[in-house]
Regions:
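Redox-cofactor-proximal catalytic regions of oxidoreductases
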Residues: 21-106, 113-114, 118-121
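Conserved redox-cofactor binding core of oxidoreductases
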Residues: 82-169
């Protein structure tokens, strides 16, 4: 989130600095160690349905065991932003590095909560980050600090964001 925020802030005229706690050679951020999976609904999906689905997720109203601390009053604005910006996320990532690729993840096809309002028509999709033309069979193929052209998962996601930061330095 910090890298994406820094990139967006820089693109909007802010002077930014990204400070990592760990040395670059041994950096093991959450993004880098993640599965590199990101949510990016299809642009052809129904935007109203996507907003309705996002509101259902963010409000907590449709989740059994809703916590008292959840604040449904903020979910409208969050759902509106989600519906507006997430369908363009894959394009935004490719702007950071044209070599970046992402593949639809069959195990995550469609909405995570299929019974929520808007789930059927929202075009929900989940992608997995990669630099190779295809992802190796093993989901946890090691690629930490390896060559960029072999990076997958969180390493690929992080390298893409890192490239976005470096091109603005």
């Amino acid at each position: 989130a910090g890298a994406a925020t820094a990139i967006t802030a820089a693109d909007n005229g802010a002077d930014v600095i990204v400070i990592e706690r760990q040395p670059a050679a041994t950096l093991r951020s959450n993004t880098r160690m993640s599965g590199g999976i990101f949510h990016c609904p299809d642009k052809s999906g129904n935007k109203a349905a996507l907003k309705e689905y996002a509101k259902a997720m963010f409000s907590g109203e449709n989740i059994p065991g809703k916590l008292e601390g959840e604040q449904p009053q903020v979910s409208d604005g969050l759902a509106e932003a989600w519906a507006e910006y997430t369908p363009g996320l894959l394009d935004w990532m490719k702007k950071q590095d044209p070599k970046f690729q992402a593949f639809a993840t069959p195990g995550f096809k469609g909405a995570a909560f299929p019974t929520f309002p808007g789930a059927k028509d929202c075009g929900y999709q989940v992608y997995r980050s990669s630099y190779p033309d295809r992802i190796p069979a093993g989901f946890n193929t090691p690629c930490y600090n390896g060559p960029k052209e072999k990076a997958i998962s969180g390493e690929a996601f992080w390298l893409c964001l890192d490239n976005g930061i470096k091109t603005r330095a």
